[in-house]
């Protein structure tokens, strides 16, 4: 590996500014061309909680009705993706192409963000290094993997997160290595704010993933800027949080206007979260980790909590609820499905007639359960809590660590990243497919092979998929090797960092460590949900924000520490 890097350094390719942008345009064109060979995936009637929910909300936005008629799903998830779909529809931009363009924009910004790490290189070589990083990010296999073909929010979530990380990294590096006149940091902070706000509004868990990095980066920049008396730049640190507050405020105001709910969700926050947290307090004889409110706990609740008795038939006897949500192997509701089952049961009882009725009902349930647990009427296994997720227990620790390690290796080797669905074919009537195609301006893989139920792909499409499969294999081999060497170089730079103790030495090291830490955090978050609630196996879709972070860390370390020592201020 050292010999290979030495030879690559000896080549020293140089680019003019015009050549750089021509190559960047060509890379973007080729990356967008990938979507020409891909077909989107849909399942009308089979994904009411996910793809159909987003599609329904997007159509409502287009019709001027915000998220549509209120029911148990309307405010159950963060809905920025529905706004994105409505925007693409307004622009007449194909769904898959829109996602690819957003990814390319975030990738290009990320490549420029890290450019100060090789600022000492000649201008032509620095452009070549920037272009190479952009190309590697643009064609990252996870960015065109099959999960992106679903009409779901994870199509854009990795790009939004990359936009945020690029903005914060770009601002931090320029705060250290340049003056305000040489390179202002406010545009980078604005980009970070857009990524933070849109990501936060796109997934409920985005705050836990993005805000730690935002706070750490802000504190590091403040230390540097205040020490150098750059007061305006220090004041500009409020920009990302102001953009986030504005985005959240707009969504909350719209929800208040249309549904009377000041909040982003009536699922992960508010009275329903209180009720779910209260239900998980009830003691149970079950030791199955995937169950949050097992059958014996529900029986105790039906007996002692009158408000829940109306839901008993739907949860315990109705055959459709059993088929839709109950795990046949466990003969019970997994934690990741129980909250949807009980919300739908409440829908059938008229509880979701409007937001105020639903809020009052779930608050009464939460208050009754907590009171019963506090006075001993119901046996309790924990204190009061408000959450739809499982509480952290000792039984989850080791399985979560194992799953997190598996997830990191899964992401490093780009597992489950085919560019198409090999066996899953879009399901829906001719009218359904026509409606989705017309709104999203793209085609779906609903055609079947002759005599089979697998999707049909043209010979040229199959050829493109094979080429992308080869590219995935190249990434899967080279990134793990480069990653190991990057970790070695990163650790070897630590002693010199401790000796020098300057901002120019410390901040790049800390920044790269932060990117790696965020990748680890995401693996840990998804691992906990997997072992405590889902039990669906390692998922590329949920780990899709990890791949670009690993690449940025690896590339940054290999370039930043390609020579002995730490880059100078």
Where are the predicted features?
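Extracytoplasmic catalytic/substrate-binding loops of multi-pass membrane glycan-assembly enzymes
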Residues: 39-57, 66-84
């Amino acid at each position: 590996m050292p010999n290979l890097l030495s030879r690559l350094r000896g080549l020293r390719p140089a680019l003019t500014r015009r050549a750089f942008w021509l190559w960047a345009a060509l890379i973007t064109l080729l990356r967008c061309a990938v979507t020409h060979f891909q077909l989107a995936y849909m399942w009308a009637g089979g994904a009411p909680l996910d793809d159909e929910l987003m599609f329904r909300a997007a159509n409502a936005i287009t019709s001027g009705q915000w998220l549509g008629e209120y029911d148990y799903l309307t405010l159950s998830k963060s809905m920025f993706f529905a706004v994105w779909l409505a925007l693409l529809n307004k622009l007449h931009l194909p769904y898959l192409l829109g996602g690819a363009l957003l990814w390319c924009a975030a990738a290009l910004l990320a490549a420029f963000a890290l450019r100060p790490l090789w600022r000492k290189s000649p201008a032509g070589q620095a452009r070549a290094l920037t272009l190479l990083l952009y190309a590697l990010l643009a064609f990252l296999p996870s960015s065109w993997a099959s999960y992106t073909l679903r009409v779901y929010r994870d199509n854009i979530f990795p790009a939004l997160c990359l936009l945020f990380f690029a903005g914060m990294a770009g601002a931090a590096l320029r705060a250290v290595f340049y003056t305000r006149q040489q390179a202002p940091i406010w545009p980078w902070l604005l980009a970070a704010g857009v990524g933070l706000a849109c990501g936060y509004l796109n997934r409920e868990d985005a705050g836990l993933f993005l805000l730690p990095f935002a706070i750490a980066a802000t504190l590091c920049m403040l230390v540097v800027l205040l020490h150098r008396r750059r007061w305006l730049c220090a004041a500009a640190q409020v920009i990302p949080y102001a953009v986030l507050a504005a985005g959240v405020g707009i969504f909350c105001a719209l929800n208040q206007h249309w549904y009377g709910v000041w909040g982003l969700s009536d699922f992960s926050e508010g009275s329903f979260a209180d009720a779910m947290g209260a239900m998980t307090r009830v003691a149970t004889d079950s030791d199955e980790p995937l169950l949050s409110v097992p059958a014996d706990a529900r029986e105790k609740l039906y007996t002692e909590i009158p408000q829940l008795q109306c839901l008993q038939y739907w949860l315990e006897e109705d055959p459709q609820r059993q088929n839709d949500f109950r795990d046949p192997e466990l003969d019970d509701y997994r934690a990741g499905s129980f909250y949807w089952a009980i919300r739908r049961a409440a829908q059938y009882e008229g509880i979701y007639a409007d937001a105020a009725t639903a809020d009052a009902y779930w608050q009464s349930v939460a208050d009754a359960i907590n009171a019963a647990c506090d006075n001993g009427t119901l046996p309790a296994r924990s204190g009061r809590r408000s959450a739809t997720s499982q509480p952290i227990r000792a039984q989850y620790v080791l399985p979560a660590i194992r799953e997190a390690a598996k997830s990191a290796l899964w992401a490093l080797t780009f597992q489950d990243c085919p560019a198409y669905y090999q066996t899953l074919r879009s399901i829906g009537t001719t009218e359904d497919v026509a409606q989705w195609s017309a709104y999203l301006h793209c085609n779906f893989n609903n055609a079947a092979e002759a005599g089979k139920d697998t999707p049909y792909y043209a010979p040229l499409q199959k050829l493109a998929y094979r080429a992308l499969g080869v590219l995935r294999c190249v990434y899967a081999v080279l990134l793990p090797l480069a990653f190991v060497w990057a970790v070695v170089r990163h650790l070897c730079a630590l002693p010199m960092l401790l000796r020098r103790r300057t901002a120019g030495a410390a901040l790049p090291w800390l920044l790269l460590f932060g990117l790696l830490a965020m990748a680890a955090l995401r693996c840990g978050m998804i691992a906990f949900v997997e072992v405590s609630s889902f039990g669906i196996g390692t998922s590329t879709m949920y780990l899709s924000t990890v791949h670009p972070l690993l690449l940025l860390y690896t590339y940054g370390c290999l370039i930043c520490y390609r020579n002995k020592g730490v880059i100078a201020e």
